[in-house]
Amino acid sequence: MGGELIREATRDGRTVARLRCYDADGMTVVDAEVLRQGSAHPLRPGPYRFTTAPDAFRFVQEALLALQYLGCRVG
């Protein structure tokens, strides 16, 4: 992959999720951060490890699509 991909989902002007995709130890890793309303501490499920970058990208795309269906803006 050779770099990192960061995407953020917002709703009503507030960040609700952030996904970071990068290479590490011969795999592609996706870290997720979910920011709950009223909480100072984000949830950090994962990390999610994939043997190929296309699999990791697909995971990120599907997660972002689900967030869009829920009314979030993705950037």
Place the predicted regions along the sequence by residue.
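Amphipathic, interaction-prone secondary-structure segments
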Residues: 9-25
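A structural signal for the main folded, soluble domain(s) of proteins
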Residues: 5, 50, 72-73
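Short aromatic-glycine-(Arg/Gly/Cys) micro-motifs in beta-strand/loop hairpins
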Residues: 20-45
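Short, hydrophobic/aromatic-rich segments at coil-to-beta transitions
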Residues: 1-7
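Hydrophobic beta-strand residues in large extracellular and virion-surface proteins
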Residues: 17-19, 30-32, 50, 60
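A short, exposed loop/beta-hairpin motif centered on an aromatic-Gly-Thr core
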Residues: 41-58
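Short intrinsically disordered terminal tails
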Residues: 1, 74-75
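Short arginine-rich
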Residues: 62-74
